[in-house]
Amino acid sequence: MFPMVTEFMNYGQQTVRAARYIGQGFMITLSHANRLPVTIQYPYEKLIISERFRGRIHFEFDKCIACEVCVRVCPIDLPVVDWKLETDIRKKRLLNYSIDFGICIFCGNCVEYCPTNCLSMTEEYELSTYDRHELNYNQIALGRLPMSIIDDYTIRTILNLPEIKT
């Protein structure tokens, strides 16, 4: 008879413990209920990009000396640098520079180690296309400056949102 009573007491203790855990979880859920939502409506509202955001790479053709440091420091040897040696002035002349953003991991090593600072990271992150071959950017496409997200009047950022009155 005693084993049955102890089993019943253990069952009661386990039930109380389970109810306490459920109550604790419910209290945490209720504490998050009166916070403002974190999600945004993406195409119409955009977050403000941080200063160190690693987006699309911007390339300045005139500054590049075709040293290929960017290719050597890239973990996947991604930038394609075509150059020709000018024998009369004994310098390399850059012919073509391209990066395939379908393969790029946006590590930023090429930007960090470039001796002439001809590469920089922009805040542009909308690179989606229907064809993966469109992600192979040459020096002309890499040289385009992105339109700033904050200055675009058609897009509401977190700063321009109307305040919610409670």
UniProtKB/Swiss-Prot annotation:
Membrane protein topology class: Peripheral membrane protein
InterPro entries per the UniProt record, alphabetical: 4Fe4S_Fe-S-bd, 4Fe4S_Fe_S_CS, NADH_quinone_OxRdtase_chainI, NDHI
Reactions catalysed, as given in the entry: a plastoquinone + NADH + (n+1) H(+)(in) = a plastoquinol + NAD(+) + n H(+)(out); a plastoquinone + NADPH + (n+1) H(+)(in) = a plastoquinol + NADP(+) + n H(+)(out)
GO molecular function, one term: quinone binding
Co-factor(s): [4Fe-4S] cluster
Pfam family, one: Fer4
PROSITE patterns hit by this protein: 4FE4S_FER_1 (PS00198), 4FE4S_FER_2 (PS51379)
Any single GO CC term annotated in Swiss-Prot or TrEMBL for this entry: chloroplast thylakoid membrane
EC number: 7.1.1.-
Residues the entry annotates as binding [4Fe-4S] cluster 2: 74, 104, 107, 110
Domain of life where this protein originates: Eukaryota
Top EC category: translocase
Keyword Plastid listed: yes
Keywords assigned: 4Fe-4S, Chloroplast, Iron, Iron-sulfur, Membrane, Metal-binding, NAD, NADP, Plastid, Plastoquinone, Quinone, Repeat, Thylakoid, Translocase
Binding-site list for [4Fe-4S] cluster 1: 64, 67, 70, 114
GO BP field: photosynthesis, light reaction
Cofactor binding, note field: Binds 2 [4Fe-4S] clusters per subunit.
Complexes and interactors: NDH is composed of at least 16 different subunits, 5 of which are encoded in the nucleus.
Family membership: Belongs to the complex I 23 kDa subunit family.
Purpose of the protein: NDH shuttles electrons from NAD(P)H:plastoquinone, via FMN and iron-sulfur (Fe-S) centers, to quinones in the photosynthetic chain and possibly in a chloroplast respiratory chain. The immediate electron acceptor for the enzyme in this species is believed to be plastoquinone. Couples the redox reaction to proton translocation, and thus conserves the redox energy in a proton gradient.
This protein's name: NAD(P)H-quinone oxidoreductase subunit I, chloroplastic
Organism listed in the record: Chamaechaenactis scaposa (Fullstem)
Lineage of the species this protein comes from: Eukaryota, Viridiplantae, Streptophyta, Embryophyta, Tracheophyta
Protein encoded by which gene: ndhI
